[in-house]
Amino acid sequence: MATSKPASIAMISLGCPKALVDSERILTQLRTEGYQVTPSYDDADVVVVNTCGFIDSAKAESLEAIGEAIAENGKVIVTGCMGVEESVIREIHPSVLAVTGPQQYEQVVLEVHRAAPPKADHNPYVDLVPPQGVKLTPRHYAYLKISEGCNHRCSFCIIPSMRGDLVSRPVGDVLSEAERLVKAGVKELLVISQDTSAYGVDLKYRSGFWNGRPIKTRMTELCAALSELGVWTRLHYVYPYPHVDEVIPLMAQGKVLPYLDIPFQHASPRILKAMKRPAFEDKTLARIKRWREECPDLTLRSTFIVGFPGETEADFQYLLDWMSEAQLDRVGCFQYSPVNGAPANELDGAVPDEVKQERWDRFMAHQQAISAARLQTRVGREIDVLIDEVNADGAVGRSSADAPEIDGCVYVGNAATLRPGDMARVRITAADEYDLHGDAV
């Protein structure tokens, strides 16, 4: 008896790694139901666009992607953070089939069913989905989302209005997913959330179970358990709460990568207060010094905003001086951009665009010099490098100091035998502002 052809889905995933995990979850469910995933508009029965709505430029990119999908395919379902602005989307693109917000996985799947019904004779026991689900990253690393939402109300941010308050995943579920990923060949787990250090607060840190033993739903205990899997564990989106000090010994012992991604956003106490950043009075520089004393190889990554309403030249100079003292390893910087619905829009003291640009240029030049000097200290050392790509010129990988896509790379010569996913020992021979160069040994 002839069988029906399975429907095909194309997915466009925009924005942060947290949105990428949402896309993976949607695709995994659809694959379980027999849908095929295609990278082509032409072969897709319907296109799902997972949007970003964090800042205006991200919204513009999302609207452009929706328009392209409509032009190339015609049957488009919109989801993700910008989905909370359905009226805006439908005003510009009235032909979209459906619009859903973030975390509405079941609704997205339902809308896909309506647009392209699943294959009636699909047998899930024959067409198996791998235990780790559908992944959109290379097979040797994966994002591990531990919670959704955020309890903070930073004045420049609208994420809580889109994704709600903090909801932590059960620790047993997180660890079981991590275990499946490692069994599937993942060499690096990138722990993500809106606020990783708040993991478990909403659950009052109650214990869950993994492999028959109790584990507290808390960042430190989660990291200790993840270290048992024998792969790199990298922490992202960590706020500098006091208990963050507890993970530094795990890093010093080699159980967790010596890498902390902490979005400081600014250094001026006055601007931090206007931003309504948590723990803005912390003596952060003193803590950074203590962390590095305990774990000398610690890499610190952060992001900053310049040109925030009310930022004076004195505030900006305070930030530059703080950067000189902090000696952060990896830094991103954004010019402040008003976000529809953010309380910061009501603040006085808007900074002119040309001043924002000038401060951004100075900030990046300042940090570039710091980065170059810090990377220079690695020349002559041997380090472990996880290989991401192999080409005619050699291999490209990342050290413990480099998260994918946002940090630098290690360019590796003498790499004829290396393959993506290999862990190579590399002697560093040169460094520039952001990257290292070396040879496999």
From Swiss-Prot:
Its cofactor is [4Fe-4S] cluster. CDD domains: Radical_SAM. Its main location: cytoplasm. Residues 7-117 form the MTTase N-terminal domain. Keywords: 4Fe-4S, Cytoplasm, Iron, Iron-sulfur, Metal-binding, S-adenosyl-L-methionine, Transferase. It catalyses: L-aspartate(89)-[ribosomal protein uS12]-hydrogen + (sulfur carrier)-SH + AH2 + 2 S-adenosyl-L-methionine = 3-methylsulfanyl-L-aspartate(89)-[ribosomal protein uS12]-hydrogen + (sulfur carrier)-H + 5'-deoxyadenosine + L-methionine + A + S-adenosyl-L-homocysteine + 2 H(+). One of its GO terms (molecular function) is aspartic acid methylthiotransferase activity. Residues 136-373 form the Radical SAM core domain. InterPro entries: Elp3/MiaA/NifB-like_rSAM, Methylthiotransferase, Methylthiotransferase_CS, Methylthiotransferase_N, Methylthiotransferase_N_sf, NA-bd_OB-fold, Ribosomal_uS12_MeSTrfase_RimO, rSAM. GO terms for biological process: tRNA modification. [4Fe-4S] cluster 1 binds at C16, C52, C81. The keyword Ribosomal protein does not apply. Signal peptide: none annotated. [4Fe-4S] cluster 2 binds at C150, C154, C157. It is found in: Cytoplasm. Residues 376-441 form the TRAM domain. One of its GO terms (cellular component) is cytosol. It is an enzyme of class 2 (transferase). Binds 2 [4Fe-4S] clusters. One cluster is coordinated with 3 cysteines and an exchangeable S-adenosyl-L-methionine. Pfam families: Radical_SAM, TRAM_2, UPF0004. HAMAP family: MTTase_RimO. Belongs to the methylthiotransferase family. RimO subfamily. This is Ribosomal protein uS12 methylthiotransferase RimO. The gene is rimO.
